């Protein structure tokens, strides 16, 4: 058997390399394996109108993503044979490059929030960003998160107290945001004043104030005027105690509040006083009492609630915890090494003060921090050489983490400055809007009171002359909005003076009250850019009763609306959607001004029973609302 195989093997090898055919006939052609067209198909990706082309194999390298899985078929359009994505095409370029090269980069000019949204949509995680861009991406993302947190805190601080807030929530909100109420602001400044008084008293009581009768030695002020300082300390501690108890009672989580750093500072600031009350003045506990009095100096840390700079410093130290830990570890190693070397280098000198390695720690610390008090100096040549090396190494070790700490402090400081600037700009912008709308509304009401607006709108020439006298296009558009609201609703804008007079007349005389001249009540004006609706009753938003009842007033701003029944003009839908040429010209001459067309189903003139709508001869004093200036 083995001999037969050995004889056949050379022929098989020869046939394998093509020297000798094994079969007498020609070998059949191998079956041609047709490659699927879908494997090398060219895919067109339409991203907001921008076309991108790539191979299907390129996308299928990452099947866990949106483009690499079958989920992309949900975005396929058979008509155009494209995959359409309504996303940002600029960021998509970098995402498509990731499929091509396997490296994801972060574009520095793009918004970090938009970039994260695009990555999340296409199923990519930020951790795959290349090393060349990852650090900058993390920094930008951290800054954006801090900025969003500051904005959220600002919005929370600026919100007014909700009616559903409990007393506990109101007290905590007053402590955290003192500018929310007058009482909270007063308590904020009172506590700050007593903190300053307590710190100053703790310093002044150690100053010599002369000798008292019967004593030759000068006594400190704290002993000579013990009663006065005790009363002052008692008043400060009482304020601090009340503040701490109120914070503890109003805290959302008392357990977290007790464990917080500021809570520990508050306890340490007031605890020595209460311990001193129960301790006697014997000599056994005098040393412990003096030690407790030292802790009163920690009251100065309470200023961190009143100083933004101290809070920034605390945030900086917290963010640089790893760098500070590295600095402490490096200094500890260097101190131990150089203290040991200095001890053995000075061991042979009889006048040496390096009596032990722990005693050499003091010299090493002073030398590495470049202080050099001179109380301990090396005597030998070897000691002086190692002392010089110790001084140089201290400069290097301390200087390494300093730039990181400074950069973090600068970043946090400028971030707080930008947040303060944004808050100030937001307040100023809202104030300008309120002032502009309030001034425009007052001017509108003044024109109505004087009868100028209705007279000048009778003709096109007078209207254009009136518009030319307007202060700004904003005021013109605001007047036009108020005019359209009068024409499309059964409301009339009146000022507070007319509103009060009308209410008094309704209360005393049961007859229709006269109202101020209104554009909607003038004769001869039958068509405007907005036609008027005719309603029987209405409901005030956020009101508990219907607008037809008396006494329901929704206060929003200083402009009043009086509900009166008028003869309806044209209530057809065609008049509401009429073109600009079919209407009276607007009270503005700019060609780019658009018109707000109100297309709301108009109620029928008759009731479902077929009766005519009853006309009310008088208006209700409660059908008055106030229109917000914002």
Curated annotation (Swiss-Prot):
Gene Ontology, cellular component aspect: anchoring junction; dendritic spine; GABA-ergic synapse; glutamatergic synapse; Kv4.2-KChIP2 channel complex; neuronal cell body; neuronal cell body membrane; perikaryon
Modified residues (Phosphothreonine): 38, 602, 607
TM region(s), chain numbering: 185-206, 227-249, 257-281, 288-307, 322-345, 381-403
Topological category with respect to the lipid bilayer: Multi-pass membrane protein
Motif PDZ-binding mapped to chain: 627-630
Intramembrane region ranges (chain numbering): 358-369, 370-377
Consequence of changing residue 315 to A: Increases peak current amplitude but has a minor effect on the voltage-dependence of activation
Effect of residue 327 to A: Loss of channel activity
GO molecular function, a single term: metal ion binding
Expressing tissues: Detected in ovary, in corpus luteum and in granulosa and theca cells in the follicle (at protein level). Highly expressed throughout the brain. Detected in amygdala, caudate nucleus, cerebellum, hippocampus, substantia nigra and thalamus. Expression is not detectable or very low in heart, kidney, liver, lung, pancreas and skeletal muscle. Not detectable in human heart atrium.
Major subcellular site: membrane
Annotated consequence of substituting residue 329 to A: Loss of channel activity
SUPFAM superfamilies: POZ domain, Voltage-gated potassium channels
Segments of this protein annotated with the region Important for normal channel activation and inactivation, for interaction with KCNIP2, and probably other family members as well: 474-630
GO BP of this protein: action potential; cellular response to hypoxia; chemical synaptic transmission; locomotor rhythm; membrane repolarization; muscle contraction; neuronal action potential; potassium ion transmembrane transport
Impact noted for substituting residue 397 to A: May impair protein folding
Location of region: Disordered: 600-630
Keyword Cell membrane: yes
Residues annotated as binding Zn(2+): 105, 111, 132-133
Gene3D superfamilies: 1.10.287.70, Potassium Channel Kv1.1, Chain A, Voltage-gated potassium channels. Chain C
Subcellular location per the Swiss-Prot or TrEMBL entry: Cell membrane; Cell projection, Dendrite; Synapse; Perikaryon
Motif (Selectivity filter): 370-375
Similarity remark: Belongs to the potassium channel family. D (Shal) (TC 1.A.1.2) subfamily. Kv4.2/KCND2 sub-subfamily.
Note: The transient neuronal A-type potassium current called I(SA) is triggered at membrane potentials that are below the threshold for action potentials. It inactivates rapidly and recovers rapidly from inactivation. It regulates the firing of action potentials and plays a role in synaptic integration and plasticity. Potassium channels containing KCND2 account for about 80% of the neuronal A-type potassium current. In contrast, the potassium channel responsible for the cardiac I(to) current differs between species; it is mediated by KCND2 in rodents.
Domain notes: The transmembrane segment S4 functions as a voltage-sensor and is characterized by a series of positively charged amino acids at every third position. Channel opening and closing is effected by a conformation change that affects the position and orientation of the voltage-sensor paddle formed by S3 and S4 within the membrane. A transmembrane electric field that is positive inside would push the positively charged S4 segment outwards, thereby opening the pore, while a field that is negative inside would pull the S4 segment inwards and close the pore. The N-terminal cytoplasmic region can mediate N-type inactivation by physically blocking the channel. This probably does not happen in vivo, where the N-terminal region mediates interaction with regulatory subunits, such as KCNIP1 and KCNIP2. The zinc binding sites in the N-terminal domain are important for tetramerization and assembly of a functional channel complex. The channel undergoes closed-state inactivation, where conformation changes lead to inactivation through an intermediate state involving breakdown of its 4-fold symmetry.
Protein name per Swiss-Prot or TrEMBL: A-type voltage-gated potassium channel KCND2
The species this protein was found in: Homo sapiens
Gene field: KCND2
């Amino acid at each position: 058997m083995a001999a037969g195989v050995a004889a056949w093997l050379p022929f098989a090898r020869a046939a394998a390399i093509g020297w000798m055919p094994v079969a007498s006939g020609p070998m059949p052609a191998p079956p041609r394996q047709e490659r699927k067209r879908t494997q090398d198909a060219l895919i067109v990706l339409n991203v907001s109108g921008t076309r991108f082309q790539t191979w299907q194999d390129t996308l299928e390298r990452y099947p866990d993503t949106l483009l690499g899985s079958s989920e992309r078929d949900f975005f396929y359009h058979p008509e155009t044979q494209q995959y359409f994505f309504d996303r940002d095409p600029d960021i998509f370029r970098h995402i498509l490059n990731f499929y091509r090269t396997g490296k994801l980069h972060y574009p520095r000019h793009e918004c970090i929030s938009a970039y994260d949204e695009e990555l999340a949509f296409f199923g990519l995680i930020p951790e795959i960003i290349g090393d060349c861009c990852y650090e900058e991406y993390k920094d930008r993302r951290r800054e954006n998160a801090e900025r969003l947190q500051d904005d959220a805190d600002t919005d929370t601080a600026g919100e007014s107290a909700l009616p559903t807030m409990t007393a506990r929530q109101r007290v905590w909100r007053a402590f955290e945001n003192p500018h929310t109420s007058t009482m909270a602001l007063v308590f904020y400044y009172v506590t700050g004043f007593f903190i300053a008084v307590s710190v100053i008293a703790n310093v002044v009581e150690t100053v010599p104030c002369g000798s008292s009768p019967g004593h030759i030695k000068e006594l400190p002020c704290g002993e000579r005027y013990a009663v006065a300082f005790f009363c002052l300390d008692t008043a400060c501690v009482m304020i601090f105690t009340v503040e701490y108890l109120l914070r503890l009672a109003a805290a959302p989580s008392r357990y977290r509040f007790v464990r917080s750093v500021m809570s520990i500072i508050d306890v340490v600031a007031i605890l020595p006083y209460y311990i001193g009350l129960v301790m006697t003045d014997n000599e056994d506990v005098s040393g412990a009492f003096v030690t407790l009095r030292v802790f009163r100096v920690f009251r100065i840390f309470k200023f961190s609630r009143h100083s933004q700079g101290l809070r920034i410093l605390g945030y900086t130290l917290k963010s640089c915890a790893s760098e500070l830990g590295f600095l402490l570890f490096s200094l500890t190693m260097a101190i131990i090494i150089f203290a040991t070397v200095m001890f053995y280098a000075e061991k042979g000198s009889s006048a040496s003060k390096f009596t032990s390695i722990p005693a050499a720690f003091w010299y090493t610390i002073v030398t590495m921090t470049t202080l050099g008090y001179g109380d301990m100096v090396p005597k030998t040549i070897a000691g002086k050489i190692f002392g010089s090396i110790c001084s140089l190494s201290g400069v290097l070790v301390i200087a390494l983490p300093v730039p990181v700490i400074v950069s973090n402090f600068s970043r946090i400081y400028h971030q707080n400055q930008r947040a303060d600037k944004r808050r100030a700009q937001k307040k100023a912008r809202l104030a300008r809007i309120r002032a502009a709308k309030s001034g425009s509304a007052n001017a509108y009401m003044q024109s109505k009171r004087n009868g100028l607006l209705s007279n000048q709108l009778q003709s096109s020439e007078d209207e254009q002359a009136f518009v030319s006298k307007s202060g700004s296009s904003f005021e013109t558009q605001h007047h036009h909005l108020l005019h359209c609201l009068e024409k499309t609703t059964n409301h009339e804008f009146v000022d507070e003076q007319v509103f009060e007079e009308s209410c008094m007349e309704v209360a005393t005389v049961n007859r229709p009250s006269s109202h101020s001249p209104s554009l909607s009540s003038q004769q001869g004006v039958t068509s405007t850019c907005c036609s008027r609706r005719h309603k029987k009753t209405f409901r005030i938003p956020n009101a508990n009763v219907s607008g037809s009842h008396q006494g329901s007033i929704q206060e929003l701003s200083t402009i009043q609306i009086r509900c009166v029944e008028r003869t309806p003009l044209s209530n057809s839908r065609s008049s509401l959607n009429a073109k600009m040429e079919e209407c009276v010209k607007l009270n503005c001459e700019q060609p780019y001004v658009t018109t707000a067309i109100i297309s709301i189903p108009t109620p029928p003139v008759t009731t479902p029973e077929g009766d005519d709508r009853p006309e009310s001869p008088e208006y209700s004093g409660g059908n008055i609302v106030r229109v917000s200036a914002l």
